[in-house]
């Protein structure tokens, strides 16, 4: 498909897009729920507000350079795991079937070999609800796995099996003990 727009008179063009790992109806519902009645500036302001809330969970002192380094690192730390579900709770599981995340937000991109030592304990300290949802997601992965295994390197409804070890056990155990 192709589109041609004549913007020679200086008008701007605003395009809204949405995705779903489930189906096109999910993408359309996501688009409606997340952007209906909002222009680009409104969506941008909401995103900035959410990120400011997330990074303000920790307060640091120091020079502006030190603060910039810290908060940039914290922002990058919090990008993943990512929400992996439609606004109605549906998501494509590790078994490639459609599931409904009831009573939790489903997350993906668990690089547990990289994150079990620091990221998961940090999330547990600064956002206990997100930590709980991440553990629910890990346990859902285990329930959907043909091997009944916790994730090793879970990515968008797939298991990459690309790291050594079984660090999901440490993450789940730590969170359970902290609850």
Question: What is the meaning of each model-derived region?
Answer:
Residues 175-179:
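Conserved small/polar residues in nucleotide/adenosyl-binding loops
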């Amino acid at each position: 498909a192709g589109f041609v727009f004549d913007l020679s008179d200086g008008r701007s063009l605003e395009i809204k897009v949405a995705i779903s790992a489930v189906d096109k109806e999910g993408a359309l519902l996501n688009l409606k729920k997340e952007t209906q009645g909002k222009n680009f500036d409104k969506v941008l302001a909401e995103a900035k507000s959410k990120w400011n809330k997330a990074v303000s969970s920790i307060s640091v002192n120091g020079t502006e350079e030190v603060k910039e380094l810290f908060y940039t690192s914290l922002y990058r730390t919090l990008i993943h795991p990512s929400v992996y579900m439609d606004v109605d709770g549906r998501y494509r599981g590790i078994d490639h079937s459609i599931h409904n995340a009831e009573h939790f937000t489903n997350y993906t991109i668990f690089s547990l070999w990289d994150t079990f030592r620091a990221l998961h304990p940090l999330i547990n300290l600064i956002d206990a609800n997100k930590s709980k949802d991440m553990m629910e997601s890990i346990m859902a992965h285990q329930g959907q796995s043909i091997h009944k295994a916790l994730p090793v390197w879970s990515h968008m409804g797939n298991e990459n099996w690309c790291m050594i070890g079984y660090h999901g056990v440490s993450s789940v155990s730590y969170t359970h003990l902290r609850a």
